[in-house]
Amino acid sequence: MNKNEELDEDELLKKCIICPPVPKALKKYWNNRYNLFSRFDEGIWLDYQSWYSVTPEKVAVAIAKSVVDFIQPELIIDAFSGCGGNTIQFAKYCPVISIEIDPIKIAMAKHNLEIYGIPSSRVTFIQGDVLDTFKSLQFAKDYRSLVFMSPPWGGPSYSGKTVYSLNDLNPYAFDVLFKEATRISPYVAAFLPRNTDVKELAAYGSIHNKPYITNFLFEGYAKAICCYFNMKGAIARKI
């Protein structure tokens, strides 16, 4: 990358970071900013999409503690890592490979990790398509690894559906993601909408490997779920 390209990327990054006054559509997320990142005022970077898609900090902490307590992973693969909400918490326990297709979000994630004091050596960022990247991560089979997936839900409109189908995930349906993830590790966790069809999720388990679901509540309202596969015991935590 030459100097002009670096300047262009810096300029694009500055344009993508949402600063006050925030757009009207993001006001409720702005009012909730300290739940997204407790250290927000230290300079957290978020683009428009990240405001409504990042995992709230307490939820990310609970997920990280659950999987670490249960399987003590040597490596965590954070698919669809975005601006780093989950990566920050995972990296406190073990090395992380973060997969994100958007270079702007990767730049934001690296910055946000610095704010939380995460050494750059702790996280390997891979810019690319998740399924293509999964194929290059077969070495992870040699480690006690976890594949964590927080695929795009399709924006805030998901909440208007009575039941959210796993086929509505974009760009890949859940069955495709799950198949490729389990080729890397038997331990898989998926962060999904609160109204996800649990009957569809149950189809990915068996008598000996039932999926376990944590329902995350905020101020008494369900916000999202995390489904754990092959991890009996990685259950609900108070947040």
Curated annotation (Swiss-Prot):
pH dependence: Optimum pH is 8.0.
Single annotated GO MF: RNA cap trimethylguanosine synthase activity
Activity control, per UniProt: Substrate inhibited by S-adenosyl-L-homocysteine.
Cellular component annotations (GO), alphabetically ordered: Cajal body; cytoplasm; cytosol; mitotic spindle; nucleolus; nucleus
Coiled coil: none
Residue pairs linked by disulfide bridges in the UniProt entry: none
Tree of life domain: Eukaryota
Annotated InterPro entries: RNA_cap_Gua-N2-MeTrfase, SAM-dependent_MTases_sf
The keyword Transit peptide is annotated on this UniProt entry: no
Main function: Catalyzes the two serial methylation steps for the conversion of the 7-monomethylguanosine (m(7)G) caps of snRNAs and snoRNAs to a 2,2,7-trimethylguanosine (m(2,2,7)G) cap structure. The enzyme is specific for guanine, and N7 methylation must precede N2 methylation. Required for pre-mRNA splicing, pre-rRNA processing and small ribosomal subunit synthesis. Involved in nucleolar structural organization.
Key words, A-Z: Methyltransferase, Nucleus, S-adenosyl-L-methionine, Transferase
Protein's name according to its UniProt entry: Trimethylguanosine synthase
Primary location class: nucleus
Source species: Schizosaccharomyces pombe (strain 972 / ATCC 24843)
Assembly notes: Monomer. Interacts with mug174; both proteins are required to maintain Cajal body integrity.
Subcellular location, record wording: Nucleus, Cajal body
Entry's Gene Ontology BP terms: 7-methylguanosine cap hypermethylation
Null allele phenotype: Abnormal exit from quiescence and abnormal Cajal body integrity.
Listed EC numbers: 2.1.1.-
Reaction equation(s) it catalyzes: a 5'-end (N(7)-methyl 5'-triphosphoguanosine)-ribonucleoside in snRNA + S-adenosyl-L-methionine = a 5'-end (N(2),N(7)-dimethyl 5'-triphosphoguanosine)-ribonucleoside in snRNA + S-adenosyl-L-homocysteine + H(+); a 5'-end (N(7)-methyl 5'-triphosphoguanosine)-ribonucleoside in snoRNA + S-adenosyl-L-methionine = a 5'-end (N(2),N(7)-dimethyl 5'-triphosphoguanosine)-ribonucleoside in snoRNA + S-adenosyl-L-homocysteine + H(+); a 5'-end (N(2),N(7)-dimethyl 5'-triphosphoguanosine)-ribonucleoside in snRNA + S-adenosyl-L-methionine = a 5'-end (N(2),N(2),N(7)-trimethyl 5'-triphosphoguanosine)-ribonucleoside in snRNA + S-adenosyl-L-homocysteine + H(+); a 5'-end (N(2),N(7)-dimethyl 5'-triphosphoguanosine)-ribonucleoside in snoRNA + S-adenosyl-L-methionine = a 5'-end (N(2),N(2),N(7)-trimethyl 5'-triphosphoguanosine)-ribonucleoside in snoRNA + S-adenosyl-L-homocysteine + H(+)
Similarity comment text for this entry: Belongs to the methyltransferase superfamily. Trimethylguanosine synthase family.
Enzyme type, top EC level: transferase
